[in-house]
Amino acid sequence: MVQRYQSPVRVYKYPFELVMAAYEKRFPTCPQIPVFLGSEVLRESRSPDGAVHVVERSCRLRVDAPRLLRKIAGVEHVVFVQTNILNWKERTLLIEAHNETFANRVVVNEHCSYTVHPENEDWTCFEQSASLDIRSFFGFENALEKIAMKQYTANVKRGKEVIEHYLNELISQGTSHIPRWTPAPVREEDARNQAGPRDPSSLEAHGPRSTLGPALEAVSMDGDKLDADYIERCLGHLTPMQESCLIQLRHWLQETHKGKIPKDEHILRFLRAHDFHLDKAREMLRQSLSWRKQHQVDLLLQTWQPPALLEEFYAGGWHYQDIDGRPLYILRLGQMDTKGLMKAVGEEALLRHVLSVNEEGQKRCEGSTRQLGRPISSWTCLLDLEGLNMRHLWRPGVKALLRMIEVVEDNYPETLGRLLIVRAPRVFPVLWTLISPFINENTRRKFLIYSGSNYQGPGGLVDYLDREVIPDFLGGESVCNVPEGGLVPKSLYMTEEEQEHTDQLWQWSETYHSASVLRGAPHEVAVEILEGESVITWDFDILRGDVVFSLYHTKQAPRLGAREPGTRASGQLIDKGWVLGRDYSRVEAPLVCREGESIQGSHVTRWPGVYLLQWQMHSPPSSVACSLPGVDDVLTALHSPGPKCKLLYYCEVLASEDFRGSMSSLESCTSGFSQLSAATSSSSSGQSHSSSLVSR
């Protein structure tokens, strides 16, 4: 595979003639570049008027490679042939170099140019490009490729420092100005000779002129190239190879997207997301640009006006900057009724609002860069989870959250600089287990999680936010104008017709199972658990009647028939001969659920075996205590048109390995999370009376 390098435009704030004098000091040897062992001139010529000077040199470079590789190759240094064409009249120096050693196995080509800055004739621009093609090298192709590119980029960085060193040396010696080239006076006889036929081989014989076209084209100043100072000032410090990847990806965009191309900081985010792997970043960016065009995301901030309901109940907003100058966004997720918002405005409106937040975040980063005079490419989010409960595990809401995470990860990589999660409750690990597989590993490293009140002390928010910026609801000094959220009134929910129009009813019906509960005939779902400390989650809506929900555990297998582990059976599963306390045990206290309520809950399992989720018709307390219906009750219920309860339910098992893994990843975010981890683990040692939450 051919490896390529392209430098940004590096600007020397000195005249071309002075830079050329500094450049010539590099020959025949240069102590400042240890790998450069020396050079000798092979050919040299000048044009009759002295304006063009052509020099061809043989340069020896020390091989900075492992001793074994040098021994196999049989060389301690390699030879390059360099051709310099200096044009004093045009004030340009074109440099071409290629390897002579191992030319049949490795092909290295380099093109460099020094030209006058297009906007300041007393400044000099330098550009450099190279290609490396390793065809065959004793089976060490990959190793040689890495060594060669590492050594090359190191020399690139050193090259600019060497020129600046010799410039300072010239100035210290009293040479701060060198006159520009002017043609010598031409006598009449010389003028007649110059007007005659010209020998076409006079200059062409001194160098491979056929290869100068691409070099000239590659380094021509077109007014749309990146210079190194701009990169350092607006994009941040980049290594030579990172600069090269940015320039190559930008050049690809200019060729394939003839119209407007993304801003440089946006392109750089995609490169950082893939650790500057050019092909992966290009494919991700290509798909994102197609997505932006399809959904007209570039116009979102001008066209999107959030509904008044969102502005009132969406508990998020911008709030000054963090200690590093990043824009700060506060989201009080625990105070937000995600289910109510989805039923009132729909998933698409919520997604558009989230996208507008990300678009605004990028805009604010640009403003911070201009204001602070240093690159700010990401923003900080302060996520307050006080109030987070089982209601937030409503399955359509979780699915919508996963979709939003996926869209943001795919199209806004590396926009989140830091995520500060405060007041994380015990239910958070369950939610984290559901969503963490969809979050990029690079993004997860930016999470800092605090449970309880440990965000208030050393190592807490004061390490990332100035005290006058910390919101008042977190004990800070700043009045925060972010909406407080709260429950969305059901009167604001969309009608069924409106929900059908947005396809929400269809999506939800695909997620849930329906069930009927008759008097004396409960509905039960069996969940087989193979390993303790797995997590069972449930989510159900009571459509008609009142029911009692319970969770049981048994080591005996109900009559499920032959089935694979992990599959579920439903219906009436508890054997009529079983005795509560002997054959099966209750692990969740009975919960009375009224018509119209929505219930979400979870249970951390203590033992393997079969867990039974049971819904039975609500009866007076004396009837609820009866664990099993009689045979006559069941037959009567099945053959009589008596009262019937209806519900929609969904249950899911988070495997023990996944749950423990998510806890480990949480604990790695901050040591303060160990308190929450211990609390969550201890909840599995007995009944958890608060593991279900009723949405009234």
From Swiss-Prot:
Gene Ontology, cellular component aspect? cytoplasm
Give the span(s) annotated as Disordered.
Answer: 178-214
What PROSITE patterns does the record tag this protein with? CRAL_TRIO, GOLD, PRELI_MSF1
| Domain CRAL-TRIO residues, every copy | 306-482
Identify the residues that the record assigns to the GOLD domain, covering every copy: 509-653
Q: Which InterPro entries match?
A: CRAL-TRIO_dom, CRAL-TRIO_dom_sf, CRAL/TRIO_N_dom, CRAL/TRIO_N_dom_sf, GOLD_dom, GOLD_dom_sf, PRELI/MSF1_dom, SEC14/CRAL-TRIO_domain
**Residue ranges of every copy of the PRELI/MSF1 domain listed in the record:** 2-175
Q: Which PANTHER family has this protein been placed in? A: SEC14 RELATED PROTEIN, SEC14-LIKE PROTEIN 5
Entry protein name: SEC14-like protein 5
What is the name of the gene encoding this protein? SEC14L5
